[in-house]
């Protein structure tokens, strides 16, 4: 009975927070929120897929900026983090404060009723596709084309994806089999037509594209000269390799961007601390730290440290995610993937 009473109290507390939202007083500064956050125990439970190589450069800056707060980084794949949060919520105790994972999984968490509608003031600096009522973009990953400079002559380097329709590329291309975002983005934003996008990728498929799982593996295959070009690589994989002398180059004229988002858990044990981090990471200050930490900042006014942002970008937005199954099926049919 005591356990049931405890669960009921927690349930209604979470429900209440979800209905009214957790918002600071109007015009409240980060330093004012910091004062409240320290009184909550000095801990931020950060559920995030932020790679350790980036986290060790980014998270300590927050801790130094806001003394008295230490970040407990719960690091796992995005699906495991959502599953963990669901299990905790069903058990009647929310443990996470902030969630920072790919947007697809942020939306899944919201559909499970785990996230708070916040409408952070910092989100006003972002375009519509990079924010929502319960999230704001933290960083981006750009799908671009790259090539081995030993195998591709300077005059043959691609300027746009259309250049890959040239017969010279047949049997020389690699890609990631799960990157249905390329088809979706081309259909929605490049061609604004399913028919034209499908026709384009069917022509690409006729070039006998070879598929390999893992974007890091694609980059290594390209560096090793086992393929001439990659169609669905991550732009941030190449600057460091080029600095080390790898014979590769990449195209930034156009590309597809997937979004990582930041959100606050309903019933977060440290609500002011969660709010502080979400506002900091979404603002200019935090976004500059993200860039210095090796990520592609989402803020329109903050440039990445390396040249990794595409000139023309087709963003995968929250509204697109519900159509993933549709385009995944078509993508697999086009390339005869299982």
Describe the function of each predicted region.
Residues 31, 45-60, 72-89, 93-226:
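Extracytoplasmic ligand-binding site segments that recognize negatively charged/polar headgroups
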Residues 58, 196, 200, 269-281, ...:
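Short amphipathic alpha-helical coupling segments at ligand-binding clamshell hinges
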Residues 104-108, 227-247:
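A ligand-binding cleft/hinge motif common to bilobed small-molecule-binding domains
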Residues 115-122, 133-137, 162, 242-256, ...:
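Short beta-strand->loop
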Residues 127-128, 140-144, 171-178, 201-205, 211-212, 281-303, ...:
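Periplasmic-binding protein-like
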Residues 144-151, 187-190, 258-273, 289-290:
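A bilobed periplasmic-binding-protein/Venus flytrap-type ligand-binding module shared by bacterial periplasmic
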Residues 304-338:
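Extracellular/periplasmic bilobal clamshell ligand-binding domains
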């Amino acid at each position: 009975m005591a356990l049931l009473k405890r669960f009921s109290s927690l349930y209604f507390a979470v429900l209440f927070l979800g209905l009214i939202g957790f918002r600071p007083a109007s015009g409240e500064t980060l330093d004012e929120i910091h004062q409240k956050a320290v009184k909550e125990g000095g801990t931020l439970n950060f559920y995030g897929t932020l790679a350790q190589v980036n986290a060790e450069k980014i998270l300590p800056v927050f801790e130094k900026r806001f003394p008295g707060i230490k970040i407990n980084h719960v690091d796992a794949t995005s699906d495991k983090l959502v599953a963990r949060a669901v299990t905790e919520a069903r058990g009647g105790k929310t443990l996470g404060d902030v969630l920072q994972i790919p947007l697809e999984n942020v939306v899944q968490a919201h559909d499970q009723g785990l996230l708070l509608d916040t409408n952070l003031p910092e989100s006003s600096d972002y375009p519509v596709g990079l924010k929502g009522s319960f999230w704001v973009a933290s960083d981006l990953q750009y799908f671009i084309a790259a090539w081995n400079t030993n195998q591709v002559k300077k005059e043959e380097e691609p300027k746009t994806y259309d250049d890959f329709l040239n017969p010279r590329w047949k049997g020389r291309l690699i890609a990631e089999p799960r990157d249905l975002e390329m088809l979706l983005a081309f259909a929605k934003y490049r061609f604004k037509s399913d028919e034209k996008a499908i026709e384009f990728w069917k022509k690409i498929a006729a070039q006998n594209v070879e598929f390999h799982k893992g974007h890091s593996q694609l980059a290594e295959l390209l560096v090793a000269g086992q393929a001439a070009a990659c169609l669905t690589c991550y732009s941030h994989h190449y600057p460091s390799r080029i600095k080390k002398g790898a014979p590769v180059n990449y195209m930034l004229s156009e590309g597809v961007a997937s979004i990582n988002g930041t959100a606050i858990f309903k019933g977060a044990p440290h609500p002011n601390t969660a709010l502080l981090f979400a506002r900091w990471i979404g603002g200019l200050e935090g976004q500059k730290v993200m860039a210095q930490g090796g990520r592609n900042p989402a803020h329109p006014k903050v440039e990445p440290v390396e040249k990794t942002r595409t000139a023309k970008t087709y963003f995968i937005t929250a509204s697109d995610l519900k159509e993933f199954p549709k385009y995944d099926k078509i993508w697999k049919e086009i390339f005869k993937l299982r």
